[in-house]
């Protein structure tokens, strides 16, 4: 049996250009070549994939602070005279003790993303179940002071939060002050609550003068502390530091002491050691999850027990155990003040390859903290914000230890299952096998704002915001992009592949409930490998069979494996994905397919994403009957390649070898295509439409002219426009036009005639004409001031040219001979 400890997790130097930009404080924006692009027509995917980087307040600098954040959790760096530590998000669960019976963190709702620590926050809403969640800690020497800055994920009640920084070494561990309940080596302790700061001697407890000062930046959720050199001067020495965050009890003047059950003022889930801290800094060696290895699990119940035992899903396994022991000595950093003095840049403490957790700033911000009352699974609302409501969101990566390919790494978007989190695949062979294939691909897993978002609304938007963030920090080849997911993530794979089909080369849903039969037709140009279990207790054989029937009805390429026997957890726990890596291979996205089928379902569109009204070289898809789905099927004859025949179902069987379960038998049914036949090349489009009133075809990408022959079959009125062509030329608008009479010629494509024209002025139709060959249009009685002219000219062949321009009306004087004398000859 393989163990994850046997895997190499090499750390390479970060790309020089990215490091240089980071230390200079320049925002690292996505290389345009790292995101999908087309020469004309609609961009693939939703608009949020291409949105600019968000400037979140928590990531901003003010005052003496200038270095950009690391945004790699568990990383340490020296940047431009500052030392930075980046913590993990939502890891503030404290010591591992006895579970609080009223803990709002439900072990059922988060069965596959359990926490290891047991501390619970006081029930006061001001603490938002997240008040002591450390985001970042910084240190910077100033002229006469040493500055520290702590950034928190939530800061609604500054007077209820405290942190302590242990400074210096000692031969024996010292008790942290103010009831923190832990010990570590230290010479001094700096404790801050609200805007009160105290520097104390670790041996005597005496307060040192002059006093440290603390300032609060509520908007950025940052607390800055300055210690005068007269009280403590590190000079150019190397100083040992440790730090922890907890809840402050103002009435008692100390850290709030955990009891068995949380009250409005006291935490619950306490431990016998009395550790009162929720979150420790400098945890650079938190273990990654083991995907249940070496335990064996087939059912959900068996898998849930193993993930609970593992306890690494929020990257706080060591934190929980160490806090429970009361001795936090292992969580420390050696801060070199000589490096800080010479403003050295050193990112060697930041993971570059292997299994990594990152942080990005979302466009969406629904408040602070964690709202456990939000349950997307059972919500009837179309928009669900998820329980992790803040602007900062985490995601997981596997970055292969390979040379960067000339065009960049591929990308595999991997979505977690119901009740799991973004770290579900961290540390897995799946991540490594899919990532290490070929020239290398980065595997990225979103949190999607909670355990049950179903990759709809804001959970779906989180996927694309994550993708955009990956593209900001790594060079990607967007032609090598695949999508996969487990259980709910498998359903999300079907969902995202069918909604945004021109983003993906291949799709790999694992035990995923299928989406609608109609949606499978949108997968025409995406080969799919699907794995299911014969004895799956959640996604049973009937769902597996429905997925296969959907694929067969749609006539797509679909490789359907059913492991026998296998429960809902077997494939993940077995953790062997060699055949999937082979299937994904080096396949590239086909963005300009000759045959496009797409379902337009506005009921799936949400405020979080742009409408799914475009795919491949089709855009402007508008449903005729609002609220009902529409479908379009378009074949371009320009390539001279016809539809390949759908081959008969191929049956086979085998065993999957190499995983933790040993040989796992499977039955396989494969739907594939034969060789594509040659057809006569023609400037022709065959368009079949249901419940769509309009569509725009991008001519260059479809391979046709601006005046192709269009064979249209529709169940109602449908306008087919041809885009990607020169717009209908209109007269210049540099000068005003005569409002009494404005005439312009109708230019059109070569060998075409304008057979119908509609002209709108400020949205009102002024002209509607039909004819054999319309050459010009005249407008009269135009507005005196600015007005907008829109012309829709239909050419022979059915394509439409549309142009819009704004003009300014005026009354021009006409030549006159009145008052002049003429000499006759």
Task: Tell what function each PLM region has.
Residues 25-34, 143, 207, 339, ...:
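Polybasic, low-complexity, intrinsically disordered segments
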Residues 34-77, 169-188, 232-323:
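Acidic/polar low-complexity flexible segments
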Residues 35-198, 248-255:
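Surface-exposed, glycine/proline- and aromatic-rich loop segments on solvent-exposed faces
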Residues 282-399, 553-557, 564-729:
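Alpha/beta-hydrolase-fold serine-hydrolase catalytic core, especially in secreted/extracellular enzymes
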Residues 389-392, 401-411:
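Proline/glycine-enriched tight loop/beta-turn segments at coil->beta junctions
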Residues 401-407, 454-488, 498-504:
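Gly/Ser-rich "nucleophile elbow"/oxyanion-hole loop immediately N-terminal to the catalytic nucleophile
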Residues 408-473:
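Active-site machinery of serine-nucleophile hydrolases
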Residues 529-532, 536:
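Short beta-strand/loop motif that positions the catalytic acidic residue
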């Amino acid at each position: 049996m393989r163990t994850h400890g046997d895997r190499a997790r090499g750390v390479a130097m970060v790309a020089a250009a990215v490091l240089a930009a980071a230390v200079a404080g320049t925002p690292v924006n996505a290389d345009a070549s790292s995101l999908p692009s087309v020469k004309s027509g609609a961009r693939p995917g939703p608009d949020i994939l291409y949105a600019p980087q968000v400037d979140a307040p928590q990531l901003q600098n003010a005052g003496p602070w200038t270095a950009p954040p690391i945004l790699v959790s568990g990383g340490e760096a020296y940047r431009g005279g500052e030392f930075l530590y980046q913590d993990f998000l939502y890891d503030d669960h404290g010591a591992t003790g006895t579970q609080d019976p009223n803990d709002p963190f439900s072990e059922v709702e988060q069965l596959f993303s359990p926490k290891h620590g047991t501390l619970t926050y006081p029930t006061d809403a001001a603490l938002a179940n997240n008040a002591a969640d450390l985001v970042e800690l910084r240190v910077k020497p100033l002229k006469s002071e040493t500055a520290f800055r702590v950034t928190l994920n939530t800061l609604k009640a500054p007077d209820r939060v405290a942190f302590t920084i242990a400074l210096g070494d000692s031969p024996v561990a010292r008790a942290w002050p103010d009831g923190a309940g832990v010990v570590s080596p230290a010479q001094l302790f700096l404790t801050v609550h609200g805007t009160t700061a105290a520097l104390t001697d670790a041996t005597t407890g005496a307060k040192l003068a002059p006093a440290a000062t603390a300032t609060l930046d509520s908007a950025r959720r940052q607390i800055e502390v300055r210690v005068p050199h007269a009280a403590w001067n590190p000079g150019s020495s190397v100083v040992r530091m440790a730090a922890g965050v907890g809840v402050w009890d103002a009435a008692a003047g100390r850290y709030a002491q955990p009891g068995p059950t949380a009250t409005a003022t006291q935490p619950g889930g306490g431990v016998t050691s009395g550790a009162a801290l929720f979150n420790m800094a400098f945890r650079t060696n938190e273990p990654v999850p083991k995907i249940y290895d070496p335990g064996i699990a087939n059912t959900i119940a068996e898998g849930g027990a193993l993930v609970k035992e593992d306890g690494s899903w929020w990257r706080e396994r060591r934190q929980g155990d160490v806090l429970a022991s009361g001795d936090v000595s292992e969580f420390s950093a050696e801060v070199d003040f000589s490096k800080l003095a010479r403003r050295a840049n050193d990112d060697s403490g930041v993971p570059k390859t292997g299994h990594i957790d990152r942080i990005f700033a979302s466009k969406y911000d629904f408040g602070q903290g964690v709202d456990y009352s939000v349950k997307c699974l059972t919500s009837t609302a179309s928009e669900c914000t998820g329980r992790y409501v803040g602007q900062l969101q985490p995601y997981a990566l596997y970055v292969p230890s390979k040379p960067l390919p000339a065009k960049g790494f591929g990308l595999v978007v991997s979505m977690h299952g119901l009740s799991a989190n973004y770290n579900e695949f961290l540390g897995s062979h799946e991540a490594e096998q899919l990532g290490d294939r070929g020239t290398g691909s980065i595997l990225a897993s979103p949190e999607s704002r909670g355990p049950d978002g179903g990759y709809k609304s804001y959970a779906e938007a989180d996927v694309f915001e994550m993708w955009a963030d990956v593209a900001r920090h790594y060079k990607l080849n967007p032609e090598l992009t695949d999508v996969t997911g487990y259980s709910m993530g498998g359903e999300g794979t079907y969902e995202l592949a069918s909604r945004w089909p021109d983003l993906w080369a291949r799709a790999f849903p694992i035990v995923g409930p299928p989406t609608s039969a109609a949606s499978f037709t949108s997968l025409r140009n995406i080969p799919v490998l699907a794995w299911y279990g014969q004895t799956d207790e959640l996604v049973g054989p009937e769902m597996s069979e429905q997925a296969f029937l959907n694929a067969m009805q749609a006539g797509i390429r679909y490789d359907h494996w059913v492991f026998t026997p296998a429960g809902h957890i077997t494939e993940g726990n077995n953790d062997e994905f060699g055949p999937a890596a082979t299937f994904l291979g080096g396949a590239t996205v086909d963005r300009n397919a000759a045959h496009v089928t797409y379902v337009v379902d506005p009921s799936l569109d949400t405020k979080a994403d742009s409408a799914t009204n475009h795919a491949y070289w089709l855009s402007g898809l508008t449903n005729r009957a609002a609220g009902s789905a529409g479908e379009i099927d378009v074949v371009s004859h320009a390539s001279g390649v016809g539809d390949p025949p759908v081959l008969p179902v191929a049956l086979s069987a085998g065993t999957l070898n190499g995983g933790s379960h040993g040989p796992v038998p499977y039955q396989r049914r494969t739907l594939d295509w034969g060789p594509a036949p040659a057809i006569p090349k023609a400037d022709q489009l065959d368009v079949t439409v249901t419940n769509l009133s309009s569509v725009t075809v991008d001519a260059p990408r479809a391979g046709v002219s601006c005046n192709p022959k269009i064979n249209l079959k529709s169940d109602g009125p449908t306008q087919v426009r041809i885009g990607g062509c020169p717009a209908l030329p209109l007269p210049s608008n540099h000068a005003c036009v005569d409002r009494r009479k404005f005439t312009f010629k109708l230019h059109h494509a070569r060998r075409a005639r304008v057979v119908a024209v509609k002209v709108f002025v400020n949205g009102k139709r002024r002209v509607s004409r039909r004819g054999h060959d319309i050459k010009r249009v005249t407008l009269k009685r135009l507005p005196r001031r600015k007005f907008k002219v829109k012309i829709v000219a239909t050419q022979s062949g059915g394509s439409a040219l549309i142009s819009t321009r704004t003009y300014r009306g005026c009354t021009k004087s006409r030549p006159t001979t009145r008052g002049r004398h003429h000499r006759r000859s």
